A protein has these predicted regions:
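ATP/nucleoside-binding phosphotransfer catalytic cores, i.e., glycine-rich phosphate-binding loops
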Residues: 71-166
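Accessory alpha-helical/coil subdomains and C-terminal extensions
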Residues: 2-68, 155-166
Length: 166
């Protein structure tokens, strides 16, 4: 079979093998729009956090670099994660080619102590938003664990994921 690849300046970045359809195609029509995207910037204030946690089912955190929460909001963020354990928190990054890696900085280690979160790895922010809205809106129909569903490859939205191997 033929293989596709993504090229960058003539260099092959990734092979994308063709995958035959193995099951019947299902269509899902529900989306959970109670998803909030918060972009981390240096000096961000914690004032908005309580309202976000109170009003949204999922908080997607777009950090700078490969992952982290600015110190200015870290304590408040961790407390809210513990106060609202049913909220889905997804850590994303603006450097999708590098992917998120919450083990790089101390704040990532702290987050793992205080918060239950999913990590976007090499997923684009658009893929994360669409997937979370789909997952939460169709939770019953999809069955299973949200973490397993999130990390399941859907149309190559996550290629490297947890194993980070090319």
């Amino acid at each position: 079979g033929s293989e596709m690849c993504i090229r960058d300046s003539g260099n092959i970045m990734r092979y994308i093998p063709p995958v035959p359809y193995e099951e019947e195609v299902w269509f899902y029509e529900e989306l959970d729009e109670n998803v909030y995207l918060i972009k981390m910037i240096p000096g961000i204030k914690p004032r908005i956090l309580r309202s976000v946690f109170e009003n949204y089912d999922c908080i997607i955190v777009e950090s700078f670099g490969v992952g982290g929460i600015p110190q200015s909001i870290a304590d408040d963020f961790y407390k809210l994660c513990q106060e609202f354990p049913d909220r889905l928190v997804v850590m994303s990054t603006q450097v999708a080619h590098e992917g998120s890696d919450m083990t790089v900085y101390e704040v990532g280690h702290d987050m793992k102590k205080y918060c239950r979160f999913l990590e976007s790895y090499d997923m684009t922010l658009e893929s994360v938003i669409a997937k979370v809205m789909w997952m939460l809106g169709n939770r019953e129909a999809l069955g299973g664990n949200l973490e397993d569903i999130f990390y399941q490859n859907v149309n190559y939205d996550v290629i490297f994921g947890k194993n980070r191997k090319c």
